[in-house]
């Protein structure tokens, strides 16, 4: 059976003190690193910040998403897109899924998901770029016939169209 190219990664979220009267802290996507394994855990805790790492995410490259990977790989800063949800009890955010496809991330956002992006580490960006180079073929543009080939009826307005 054909195996799809997959990389495992860990997502890091950070809670930082906010200088605001409406909120005392704010969460943000801090980074994505090669998978460290194990369970979600706190990796940094100070009076001003809390960082949690969430291991065990996979990004798999699919041929039908090749255009989305191409758009990402050819951008100035290739990124990992992470869908983030909020725990109903603690109200803390947690990463739900990750992708390298611009198009897939856009579909998630269209569906109401909160999606953040973070720069992909160099090896991950190179891996995606090599896959795109080997697998992505843009769809050929359909040539439009010049209007001169439509004949007189297609170029001239009909009596009732004036």
Regions found by a protein language model. Give the residues of each.
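Terminal targeting/leader modules
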Residues: 1-119, 137-162
